[in-house]
Amino acid sequence: MNDPEWAQIVVMDSLASLPALEDLRISLGGAPASSLKLELLTNLRKITISGYCPNYKQDVVSGLHTLIANSPRLTYLDVGYNTRANVLDVSSLHGLFNGVPRDIPLDLRHLVLRNWCVRLDEITLPHIRLLESLSLHLNIEPQQIASHQAAEEPETSHTLSRTAQYCSTTSEIWTTLREERIKLKEISTDEITPAFLEYIASYSGLEKLTLTFTTAREDDVYTSEKLALKFYNEVLPMHAQSLTTLDICPIYEGKWCFGSHNAASLHLCTKLQNLRIHINSEEIDRPKKDVVVRSVLSPFLFLPFSPYLFL
């Protein structure tokens, strides 16, 4: 949305006049979005808002809060955004859901959150009981908010304190999902913790798993390597009969990459249709690269499907 304000107003008025509108997709290009009157819309089933704009919380979240409350059939919500003007522009999942009647919760099946404060409690949990797909990236944790408080003026610090109460750590989110027995079929995340592995080890039936920038919190390589071994040896086999997509993109070579330590576990995943994984260069004999590639590919060539491989 980089059009002049008058054009944005015309577009929003036109959208509001479409009674059968169910799927809304908006890409913010960095320009002001004060004319984005999401509160004018109702009864949507899918909402996707990507990109960024100044005053995101004021111009987007406030209207989105009303739109969600007026869309009881909403099943798909994608509200990832890439940047914010300042720390006060942080938004929370509570800010989206607290207008929805508790006795008539949403039936969300697909949720994408990027750069949000997330806390799963009596306000937010009812709306994700039926969730099947979750993408959780750049989760804003309480300590990130706290680190800004000391440097801010008292009024700003008080605002940040209120925001922090709607944040929880990534580990707390996965622990709550496990305790509430919410069994996701599709997961995409960028932080791997013991709590995450405990969650996906608590059930079977995962179909799509994407792990990006796979590393441990605090950039502890040793811890990350231990988590990788646990994932391949103990967790992945739990979903070997259901997994169709596995995408693992670590930030450095190590145990998350393909090698002799995880080949057996990967070969158990007989329903894989899409596999993307890095290969440890230290395990490749340069003069025999073609032999190494064949050794990686051969177990997958005999699967019932013809999987897409990205190595």
List each language-model region with its residue ranges:
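Leucine-rich repeat
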Residues: 1-311
